[in-house]
Amino acid sequence: MERAEFHLSFVGDSVIGERANCEAGAMIANYRNEREDKRIRIRIGDVVVDTGVEKFGALVGDDARIGANAAIAPGAVIHARTIVPRLSLVDQGA
């Protein structure tokens, strides 16, 4: 993750692209305590991929920007050059 910048945030067990930026207070959660089945799944288009693990954050693409106090759910995919507005929730619900 060359030159990625993350300011006072929680980033749990995630894959972060180059030059990604995360403003203060943003959270990338890595555990789904609200579900019976804790395994993390990732939705890519119409395909759901089971990671086989209970702790996995998000896939954050190159040059993505995550605004202050945004909440990113486990298994979320933030594509390259995506801008997540401040106070947003990103949850693909896979």
Question: What are the language-model segments listed below?
Answer:
Residues M1-A94:
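Glycine-rich hexapeptide-repeat left-handed beta-helix
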